[in-house]
């Protein structure tokens, strides 16, 4: 901006000089026409001297302005640096200003985590524990010792057998009759037997094997005991550890 201002000032000065030269030439012509030659020469020399002085003065002013512009370009104001001043790490908040209440941010499950949990469930399904079958046991007061040699001891009271007569058909009883062969004990395994709970009364959803315990003994044609009245070995449900 300063350079443009200086250029404008120089142009104005040159224009003024041209005007003055034109005026001086006109005055010289007028004087030469009116006065003798000696006076015209003196006036011309005087005018030329004044013009030279003005031109020199304007040239000096322009040089001074250019020097100041160059100095101002190189010399720029630098920020004041305090050697012992430490920067403030945080903005100082006045005490009158209260912090704004922010809404609580709740964690949410990403869809990738949900897919991983579902894949684990499909790969490693949970084991279903099979319930143990409850075998009915006759109370100790009504229990009788079963002896194949004594037919009277094998007979049980009728009120214990009546609730099971209408549940199991005779066709099932005939197909599920045990053979007359001696019952072999199952091979012993390392699994410890699970004790069966004692039920003081017979249940309706009892298996057919339990029903055979309450059946009346019947004598065959040869006078021997029917195989259904043979004692049944108690079945233990193994527990897998």
UniProtKB/Swiss-Prot annotation:
Free-text description of this protein's post-translational modifications in UniProt: There are at least five different forms found in milk, with varying degrees of phosphorylation. These include form 3-P which is phosphorylated at three sites that have not been determined, this form is present in very low amounts, form 4-P which is phosphorylated at four sites, form 5-P which is phosphorylated at five sites, form 6-P which is phosphorylated at six sites, and form 7-P which is phosphorylated at seven sites.
Tissue specificity as recorded in UniProt: Mammary gland specific. Secreted in milk.
Matching PANTHER family: BETA CASEIN (PTHR11500), BETA-CASEIN (PTHR11500:SF0)
Positions marked as site (Not phosphorylated): 30, 32
Residue list for modification Phosphothreonine: 27
Positions of modified residues (Deamidated asparagine): 150
Subcellular localization, as worded in the UniProt entry: Secreted
Residue(s) carrying Phosphoserine: 24-25, 30, 32-33, 38-40
Gene Ontology terms: biological process: lactation
Organism: Equus caballus (Horse)
Nuclease as UniProt keyword: no
Protein name: Beta-casein
InterPro entries: Casein, Casein_beta, Casein_CS
Family: Belongs to the beta-casein family.
């Amino acid at each position: 901006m300063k350079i443009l201002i200086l250029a404008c000032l120089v142009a104005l000065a040159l224009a003024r000089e041209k005007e003055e030269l034109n005026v001086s030439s006109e005055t010289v012509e007028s004087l030469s026409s009116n006065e003798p030659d000696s006076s015209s020469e003196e006036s011309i020399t005087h005018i030329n001297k004044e013009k030279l002085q003005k031109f020199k003065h304007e040239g000096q002013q322009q040089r001074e302005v250019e020097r100041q512009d160059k100095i101002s370009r190189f010399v720029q104001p630098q920020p004041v640096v305090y050697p012992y001043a430490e920067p403030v790490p945080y903005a100082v908040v006045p005490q009158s200003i209260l912090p704004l209440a922010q809404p609580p941010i709740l964690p949410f499950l990403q869809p990738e985590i949900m897919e991983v949990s579902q894949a684990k469930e499909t790969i490693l399904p949970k084991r279903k524990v099979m319930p143990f079958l409850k075998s009915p046991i006759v109370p100790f007061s009504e229990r009788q010792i079963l002896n194949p040699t004594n037919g009277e001891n094998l007979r049980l009271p009728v009120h214990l057998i009546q609730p099971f007569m209408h549940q199991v058909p005779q066709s099932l009883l005939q197909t599920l009759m045990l053979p007359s062969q001696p019952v072999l004990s199952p091979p012993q395994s390392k699994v410890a037997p699970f004790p069966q709970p004692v039920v003081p009364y017979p249940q309706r959803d009892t298996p057919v094997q339990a029903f055979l315990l309450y059946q009346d003994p019947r004598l065959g044609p040869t006078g021997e005991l029917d195989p259904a009245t043979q004692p049944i070995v108690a079945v233990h449900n193994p527990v897998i550890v």
